[in-house]
From Swiss-Prot:
Protease subunit of a proteasome-like degradation complex believed to be a general protein degrading machinery. GO terms for molecular function: metal ion binding; threonine-type endopeptidase activity. Its EC number is 3.4.25.2. It comes from the Bacteria. It catalyses: ATP-dependent cleavage of peptide bonds with broad specificity. This is ATP-dependent protease subunit HslV. Keywords: Allosteric enzyme, Cytoplasm, Hydrolase, Metal-binding, Protease, Sodium, Threonine protease. Allosterically activated by HslU binding. Na(+) binds at residues 164, 167, 170.
Length: 179
């Protein structure tokens, strides 16, 4: 049995001048045990102007949150620059390369996925999801964005709710943060 602690779903959207990020609360040990149902995987950074959410190993994600916040401070809140610098450090550092997590970071102007392979990806349609239920949340979010007048916050919540109904590694203890 794989005893790493992981699995989650994070969804982010920008719409009509608003930005929202949602994450579920489940932490799973391996593939059989729910360790925690109320984890907070979406955080406000840089005086509340940036949202960050993680999927993957909890301990690794805390390391990345800390490093990303340091980069935000270093580059005066420039999200893109901080994300690129984090990705370069993550990919280039032997110890950091071992970290098993992905991040979504966003402000009111941008959404980015940052990975340990050095990638920084900006979605074409102002919404993105990562984690075990990411594809389910992304599908729901795209449909809701195209065919409803829901707010960014409501789409984020509903997308996570759909993912929680399909993915066993995602629960419906959903936290939504909005900018």
């Amino acid at each position: 049995m794989n005893n790493s602690i992981h699995a989650t779903t994070i969804f982010a959207i920008r719409q009509n001048g608003h930005a929202a990020m949602a994450g579920d609360g489940q932490v799973t040990l391996g593939e059989q045990v729910i360790m925690k149902q109320t984890a907070r995987k979406v955080r406000r950074l840089y005086d509340g102007k940036v949202l960050a959410g993680f999927a993957g190993s909890v301990a690794d994600a805390f390391t990345l949150f800390e490093k990303f916040e340091t980069k935000l401070q270093e580059f005066s809140g420039n999200l893109e620059r901080a994300a690129v610098e984090l990705a370069q450090e993550w990919r280039g550092d032997k110890q950091l390369r071992q970290l098993e997590a992905m991040l979504i970071v966003m402000d009111k102007n941008s959404i980015l996925v940052v990975s340990g392979t050095g990638e920084v990806i900006s979605p074409d349609d102002d919404l993105i999801a990562i984690g075990s239920g990411g594809n389910y949340a992304l599908s729901a979010g795209r449909a809701l964005k195209r065919h409803t007048e829901m707010s960014a916050k409501d789409i984020a919540y509903a997308s996570l709710k759909v993912a929680s109904e399909i993915c066993v590694f995602t629960n419906d203890n959903i936290i939504v943060e909005e900018l």
